[in-house]
């Protein structure tokens, strides 16, 4: 009888060095690390959601095609329902893109940017080709065009507004890349509600364009994991081949649809976030030695005179959690989500303490 079992020996060799993704959980801190909506969920919309789901039979599987939600999204985006695909968060859709078009191939991506593209690419055995951003974190359009045209590159990715830098890429520049390549061009617009111009008007002209969106940021549904994708039907037909059956549960579908029917309170919250973003940027920039970068998202990237790890640890000790993004192109940088006025005030106060200067 065989008694020795080694799971690691059976796992894919190319994944042995991959570290599981872990999000820190500190329930007793001011949480400014995940770019969440700080104002919580509008009570009146929550009441509408609970009323909607109260009549549902949870013993039945959800609508696999999420038809009613796609109809609601069509009204919001101006895109036909057949050109919309929903997922269990945008993460699932990113992985589906990599599995469908990238396995055994390469993808080009403007860096620094959202780290999950690299992780999902690796899971799908799709090699990453990094295209460093220019000064001010602008996309190097000519370099992206060259990378997208390299042998084996089947996907090109641009996040706008970009996480973690906060800057947006004009649609005109993305159109230059679309014109130059037959590869899939993924435009991640997770933060579109906070700034920048959308590439949705380009969809009808470029069959290789894919746009990703999420309910996690502007619409305060991070806990329910709802993302969606806009693309031509031929692209979606291919993506559906790898989609998990019943990938978006009935509660999440209903909640997202109710959100689309009740946009005014979310727009008010977005307005408050934008106002706080400007105030936070001004106060960060006023701290000696701190460089804050302009943002069109719901977070701000900043560079400190101290090592980022020390600043991160010092803030955490004082009850404030931010994101340490120190790395290539982001030396001594951290990212802070725009919180409520009180959260932002506390963050500035504690950052001043960590840096040894009065805030």
From Swiss-Prot:
Its EC number is 2.6.1.9. It is an enzyme of class 2 (transferase). Pathway: Amino-acid biosynthesis; L-histidine biosynthesis; L-histidine from 5-phospho-alpha-D-ribose 1-diphosphate: step 7/9. It catalyses: L-histidinol phosphate + 2-oxoglutarate = 3-(imidazol-4-yl)-2-oxopropyl phosphate + L-glutamate. It holds the Pfam family Aminotran_1_2. The keyword Transferase applies. GO terms for molecular function: histidinol-phosphate transaminase activity; pyridoxal phosphate binding. The modification N6-(pyridoxal phosphate)lysine is found at residue 217. Keywords: Amino-acid biosynthesis, Aminotransferase, Histidine biosynthesis, Pyridoxal phosphate, Transferase. GO terms for biological process: L-histidine biosynthetic process. Its cofactor is pyridoxal 5'-phosphate. Homodimer. HAMAP family: HisC_aminotrans_2. Belongs to the class-II pyridoxal-phosphate-dependent aminotransferase family. Histidinol-phosphate aminotransferase subfamily. This is Histidinol-phosphate aminotransferase.
